[in-house]
Amino acid sequence: MSSRGYEAVIGIEIHVQLSTKTKIFSSESTAFEAGDNENTSPVSVGMPGTLPVLNSKVVEYSIKTGLALGCDIRRKSVFARKNYFYPDLPKGYQISQYDQPICENGSITFKVDGKEKTVSITRAHMEEDAGKSNHHGEYTLINYNRSGIPLLEVVSGPDMRTPQEAAEYARTIRQIVRYLDVCDGNLEEGSLRCDCNVSVRKEGAKQFGTKVEIKNINSFRFVEKAIEYEIERQIDCVERGDKIIQETRLWDPDKNRTFSMRAKEDAQDYRYFPDPDLQPVIVTDSMIEKYKKELPELPIARAQRFQDDHALPELDATVLTTEKDLADFYEDTAKESKNFKASSNWIMTELLRELNSANKNIKDSPIKPAQLGKMIAMIDKGTISGKIAKTIFQEMWASGNDPEVIMKEKGLVQISDPAAIEKLVDEVLAANAQTVEDHKSGKKKNLFGFFVGAVMKASKGQANPDLVNKILLEKLK
């Protein structure tokens, strides 16, 4: 991003809350809706004499995420203690990973404004979450339910230059972890949190400027807005001759600005050292091969397959692969209908509109893929028209019934008998003799659509429109 002769340098740390049933080092539930301090134990609140035991699912989910991000998986990684004091960190240290993380040297590619962008993944490391401080005027309450929740912190390289690239990078990470089913990606509940590191430098300069970290960002729109604000703030500082302080700032969505929170610590301030209570994590080749085989087809590859094998436009393929459940729904529909583009069209227009209007996700759709696929096949066979299909679709949405059942109950079978349609056409032409004369003489133009509409109305929308057009063309010569 070029602004007033400056270039932004952006990196993002994304804390992915892994969807395990229990915490990283203890057996309490990770359920979000639990009451305050309900999901705690002597381990998660740091009582003396307690020992952590690593949850193996955390290792599995971390390796799968690393593989999906193209990372190298360390055969031996080490937990370290990150030492700092804060009321919601009862042990006085956080168990994390430092110089030997489980995943390193990956990258992801995505599109921004139609152009491909590749961002490096420096590392992804396992760690425990801290508790949560709730500030109430003169006092603070602490909820330790979150203490010990398993996180995988995914750290990008400083490769992004615009707020739009940063937001799309974060969206892509969320899309991948949701495809893997290792995180629900709920930003509002904090199961995916973005910390953005921003600096500015003169265009063409090679040296990085002073980095500022922005926290408290809980939507992708705010990722863009917070970075946009911070870029302009830093440029203003430089042009005034002020020194940019290495600090952590909070994004305030109500005021659309960032505020200073605290001076930003360097790694040496945390006095990292290997945790003596935890063994190194040993990853074998057989584990990696097993998890590779269990990986789903990832969104970019799936979208490309939809374009190559199903001849779908890029827009369709991109929309349909936004969520794994949506892509699955499309494939199941197309398998039943044998019509890729029609399946895409019905899902992207009719179904997604109804889902959005009802605030439902694809899993909650009352219309199942097999039902939608059958309805599309009925159109292609000429059993029903597109107009009848829309009526059946609405009935399917309301009742969840199969399209054949609705068609029979409502008498919605398409009339495809040429003799029956010819009879309807003759009746319409006889009832509109003057209009027929006007059409044939050329006195009035563009009347053909009137006759089509009249025949369709007479048939209550059940006449085969192709046959109606064909017979009318013959009779109106």
Curated annotation (Swiss-Prot):
Allows the formation of correctly charged Asn-tRNA(Asn) or Gln-tRNA(Gln) through the transamidation of misacylated Asp-tRNA(Asn) or Glu-tRNA(Gln) in organisms which lack either or both of asparaginyl-tRNA or glutaminyl-tRNA synthetases. The reaction takes place in the presence of glutamine and ATP through an activated phospho-Asp-tRNA(Asn) or phospho-Glu-tRNA(Gln). Heterotrimer of A, B and C subunits. It comes from the Bacteria. It is an enzyme of class 6 (ligase). Its EC number is 6.3.5.-. Keywords: ATP-binding, Ligase, Nucleotide-binding, Protein biosynthesis. The lineage of its organism: Bacteria, Pseudomonadati, Bdellovibrionota, Bdellovibrionia, Bdellovibrionales. This is Aspartyl/glutamyl-tRNA(Asn/Gln) amidotransferase subunit B. NCBIfam families: gatB, PRK05477.1-2, PRK05477.1-4, PRK05477.1-5. PROSITE patterns: GATB (PS01234). InterPro entries: Asn/Gln-tRNA_amidoTrfase_suB/E, Asn/Gln-tRNA_Trfase_suB/E_cat, Asn/Gln_amidotransferase, Asn/Gln_tRNA_amidoTrase-B-like, GatB, GatB_C_1, GatB_Yqey_C_2, Gln-tRNA_amidoTrfase_suB_CS. It catalyses: L-glutamyl-tRNA(Gln) + L-glutamine + ATP + H2O = L-glutaminyl-tRNA(Gln) + L-glutamate + ADP + phosphate + H(+); L-aspartyl-tRNA(Asn) + L-glutamine + ATP + H2O = L-asparaginyl-tRNA(Asn) + L-glutamate + ADP + phosphate + 2 H(+). One of its GO terms (molecular function) is glutaminyl-tRNA synthase (glutamine-hydrolyzing) activity. Gene3D superfamilies: 1.10.10.410, GatB domain, N-terminal subdomain. Belongs to the GatB/GatE family. GatB subfamily. GO terms for biological process: glutaminyl-tRNAGln biosynthesis via transamidation; translation.
